[in-house]
Amino acid sequence: MNSFLNRIYRYLIPSALLILFAAGNGIAQENLKSAEKIPYKQFLDNIEQQLPELRKNRIQVEKAKNTLYGAGSAEDVNLSAESAYSKTDVFSQGASLEKKDFSSKIGLTKKIAQTGTEISTGAGYNRTEYEAEGSAAYHYPSLYVKFNQSLLKNAFGIVDRYAVNDAKMQYDIQKLREIETDKTDINYYKKLYFTWIEYREELKLLNSYITGAKQIEETVKSRFKSGMVNSADLYSASAIVLKYQVAYEVLNTDMNALRTELNIFFKDKNIIPDDDEFPAFYTTSMTSEYQGIPFDRTRNAEIFRLTKNNLKYTADVSENKLLPQLDLVGEYTKKSADVSFSKSTENLNSTDYYLGFSFTHPLQNTESRSKLDETKLAIDEINSEYSISDNSYKKSLGAIISNHKDAERILALREKRIEILNAKYRFELQKYQQSQLDLQTVIDTAIEVTNERISVIQLKKQIIENYIDYSDLTEMP
């Protein structure tokens, strides 16, 4: 009878071990009927719509756009008006007379930034009267046009155009910076999606091993009660169950933290990732070419180029500001005078005009010189930053390409090791069946297989993350 039971238990334990080992090759099924499967793109779209960092980046672009809008105010038409009243005592032929003047003027001024020209036009009216017997009031209406044309400083509107051109450059730079900053902010969530799948796969794997380990434990307990195995096998069987349970709970803690983080964006929705995205993205990551794209072809390099061009342009304007202010000025006025207001406005038959030059030049011009020196230093600084970023890019790109090649080799070795461990397991199982090996040795090999399979899942996720970093780093404008 004992011989018969011994044969039965020898069959049961290897069968249970085979169940444990086979469980690692499959994935335990979950009840996912009520869960909504969310694809990778939909996941990112949802994050991008809510991520506050991205909203902040968009605000920076809107601020730059608003600055551009406001920069054109230099060419706005300005309306001006003035009115005055005065009383003066004048002496005429030994007598004192009271002179009263009323004057008003209204006009429009427009600056043409493309040429550095300022044009004003308007109308004026003066009324003068003397308080004396028989005196009358005189009316002086007038129309005028005058201009101011810069010849040295601000020649052809180089200074007037600066505000608009600088704002345009800053707007273009900010739009590129938004893309780069958005990419950096969303990079974490791209990887988080595949970490989510990784945790799920590992939890399923551990759950299936726990099921198999419990079957081993029950089989060994029965055999122990019959006195067919010693306490060591019983402890080993119980220990492997606890080992997998601890590993499961530790990983489940990480999964709960991940779900809590995602809950910020998905508001307690019962969602799961599309597990098919993992092998598809992994295949893309493995088959893509990791080219050594030069830094000057990337969007970051384009940002540097635009920034440098902006600084060079600023330096040119600053140099122009060091020139003297030499302007060609002129005015043309039509006017008339009459004691009758109606007659004075009927025919503006008198003409005044002048043409001349205006010259001003600060002897030190400290502010403009300081601005020019500051801009030249900024150009030197941006050149240094470009070189630093170029070196950093080359370092990062080299590491990514190297990591990809290394990961391919390591993955091949790990998969080969799983094959060897499988063979080792079968050999040890045979020895155990022949009572030439203890249960713990077989269990240790099963644990090695488990760890190696988990390492393969993690390595594949690292390959995906490496590809995401490569795509972000080398993205062109």
What are these regions (language model features)?
Residues 55-59, 72, 113-138, 152-177, ...:
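Sec/SRP-type N-terminal targeting helices
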Residues 13-22:
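Bacterial N-terminal signal peptides
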Residues 251, 299, 382, 459:
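Metallo-beta-lactamase
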Residues 71-72, 78, 262, 314-319, ...:
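Coiled-coil termination/hinge junctions
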Residues 28-102, 153, 159-162, 166-168, ...:
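Bacterial Sec-pathway N-terminal export signals of envelope proteins
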